[in-house]
């Protein structure tokens, strides 16, 4: 029997991950009510099935991959449906949120009886023939996400509570931005002093500075 996964919503990341899951044998559900024509076409191209909001609760796992500002509202909108469903899917919030907000979402969904997992996607949407982004998961029930590893996703489990995966993503992003900011400042300083050509040459030869 195929694993059934609901992905909300089919944006650039959600549809690309859906395509990877479908490629590896999963059945992927979504709800396209009120969505734009471009979103509908993207979802269909990824092999996603348009189902009623009520059917979403029948999935084995629900992956929330929405704009960060919509994540809390989505969780609240699903509470009644998930609470009343006899089938209890695993809910993985994969959005770029703070650890505090991830904990808030877990609290919102606690009454549903569903297992809640904190997820964090690091990397670009998966492309055909490429490994794709890393999906970090944390929380007491994070082991229940392991099936995603068999469906083509690069799943990384963190031994930490809800919020740990979110903290990893925030820290990683902060380090990258800090490195780039320092690098840009140094390149500008070199340029002002007439050393930019030599600096670029040196950076090109020094593998440890290949980021720049």
Provide a role label for each language-model segment:
Residues 1-58:
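NAD(P)+-binding Rossmann beta1-loop-alpha1 motif at the extreme N-terminus of oxidoreductases
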Residues 5, 97-177:
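Rossmann-fold dinucleotide-binding core
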Residues 10, 32, 64, 94-95, ...:
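Glycine- and other small-residue-rich loops at beta-strand/loop junctions that grip anionic moieties
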Residues 28, 50, 115-116, 155, ...:
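Hydrophobic beta-strand scaffold residues
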Residues 51-100:
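Rossmann-like NAD(P)-binding element
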Residues 168-212:
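Helical "substrate-binding/catalytic lid" subdomain
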